[in-house]
A protein has these predicted regions:
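Bacterial N-terminal signal peptides that target proteins for export
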Residues: 1-7
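A generic "folded-domain core" signal
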Residues: 20-161
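Bacterial N-terminal signal peptides
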Residues: 7-16
């Protein structure tokens, strides 16, 4: 059941991100940063990427990393029930989440702010998550190319009336 919920969330993020990107006429594949605005509970523009585990990881391994401009929170969505997620930008130390609810592990506001600055300036990040069944997703690498551009688009869209 949790796998279905995460898969549905992943599809919703990708579908809404692809529609937000339709001005360029391109759908966004995994491993690319996209901007999306959701109006369900008030305007919330996010920058997110679905990081595919690729051929060197377990079949179907993926994580979604998403930064909410409205809530100024960085979240890692896992396929399963998360216990903890961690992120490393370039050669900086690993930073871990303190809050996991279901498949979503969020960094607190201070860590989210610090990581946002690192993501804006960095070249590459690595994300991993430990799950309640003691399995591990990752470490999964992701380029930060395009993150800053999509973040600026999200900020402008968030401020639009």
């Amino acid at each position: 059941m949790n796998r279905s919920v995460v898969a549905a969330l992943c599809l919703a993020v990708l579908a809404s991100s692809a529609s937000a990107q339709s001005f360029g006429g391109q759908n966004q594949p995994p491993d690319q940063w996209v901007m999306n605005c959701n109006m369900e509970k008030g305007r919330d523009c996010t920058v997110s990427a679905m990081i595919d585990g690729g051929p060197n990881n377990l079949l179907g391994t993926f994580l979604i990393v998403s930064y909410s401009v409205a809530y100024t929170t960085l979240t890692v969505v896992v396929d399963g029930v998360g216990q903890r997620a961690a992120m490393q930008v370039d050669e900086w130390p690993w930073v871990s989440t303190g809050i996991c609810t279901g498949g979503a592990c969020s960094f607190d506001q201070q860590k989210s702010s610090d990581l946002l600055q690192a993501l804006l300036k960095g070249q590459r990040m690595v994300v991993q998550a430990s799950l309640q069944d003691d399995s591990m997703a990752g470490p999964l690498p992701m380029s930060l190319s395009g993150f800053a551009t999509q973040y600026q688009r999200a900020v402008r869209a968030q401020q639009a009336k």
